[in-house]
Amino acid sequence: QGRHPPIPPAP
């Protein structure tokens, strides 16, 4: 939780 792009769910 901070200033970073959302991480997409891994397949």
UniProtKB/Swiss-Prot annotation:
The keyword rRNA-binding does not apply. Expressed by the venom gland. The modification Pyrrolidone carboxylic acid is found at residue 1. Its main location: secreted. Disulfide bonds: none annotated. GO terms for molecular function: peptidase inhibitor activity; toxin activity. One of its GO terms (cellular component) is extracellular region. It is found in: Secreted. Keywords: Hypotensive agent, Metalloenzyme inhibitor, Metalloprotease inhibitor, Protease inhibitor, Pyrrolidone carboxylic acid, Secreted, Toxin. GO terms for biological process: regulation of blood pressure. This peptide evokes slight hypotension (-2 mmHg), when injected alone into rats. It has no bradykinin-potentiating effect, when 60 nmol of BPP-11h are coinjected with 0.5 ug of bradykinin into rats. It inhibits angiotensin converting enzyme (ACE) activity with a K(i)app of 87.07 uM. Belongs to the bradykinin-potentiating peptide family. This is Bradykinin-potentiating peptide 11h. It comes from Bothrops jararaca (Jararaca).
